């Protein structure tokens, strides 16, 4: 996909995936508008990382939207009374780190922003293969949201739709890490951990998936 001189709103959380999408867009010479959310999550480490990534890639604009999903909780990421799981991802079971409706809300806000600034794309770091099985990170969800987006705004109705761009959707975490380094993402400045300690916990699902993939990528890199 040719992104040169195209405007793109990237949902930039500060994690590895969204930072990689930002890096790919930057290398493609797109005009990047970053959007993060202070949504009542357990910590603000990822927002700090998002700000660092936005500055690193010198994007056009970076906004942090206040939207408090902790008002009703429903997830261990927005409710401190729920424990973050450390026993691993269970097959065919959605973990309690899933935040009800989060991606639907965030992409809807991004769609409004994109339409207001006449952006061509919304960049998402969702990937379906080795993440936690969230329902709003899957190909069928992205396909249906695109259909909704095409009906829900002026550009879509005028046959000039804003497209959801998901370059990582079918990649595993090792492949994403390779892309991150290939696109000059400051890997050590991204934040994936569910906890807000000074250093990543190394125990939560997100840490373990990231660390295992990094070790695999590094081993393969050193063999070459």
From Swiss-Prot:
Kindly state which reaction or reactions the protein catalyses: 7-carboxy-7-deazaguanine + NH4(+) + ATP = 7-cyano-7-deazaguanine + ADP + phosphate + H2O + H(+)
- Residues bound to Zn(2+) are 193, 201, 204, 207
EC code(s) of this entry: 6.3.4.20
Query: What pathway does the UniProt record associate with this protein?
Result: Purine metabolism; 7-cyano-7-deazaguanine biosynthesis
Single GO molecular function: zinc ion binding
Which co-factor is required?
Zn(2+)
Residues given in the record as ATP binding sites: 12-22
Which top-level group of life is the source organism from?
Bacteria
Any binding details for the cofactor?
Binds 1 zinc ion per subunit.
Q: Which keywords are on file for this protein?
A: ATP-binding, Ligase, Metal-binding, Nucleotide-binding, Queuosine biosynthesis, Zinc
The reply on keyword Membrane is: no
Q: Which Pfam families match?
A: QueC
Under the heading NCBIfam families, the entry gives: 7-cyano-7-deazaguanine synthase QueC
* Database matches in HAMAP family: QueC (MF_01633)
This chain's function reads: Catalyzes the ATP-dependent conversion of 7-carboxy-7-deazaguanine (CDG) to 7-cyano-7-deazaguanine (preQ(0)).
Q: What is this protein called?
A: 7-cyano-7-deazaguanine synthase
Source organism per entry reads Prochlorococcus marinus (strain MIT 9301)
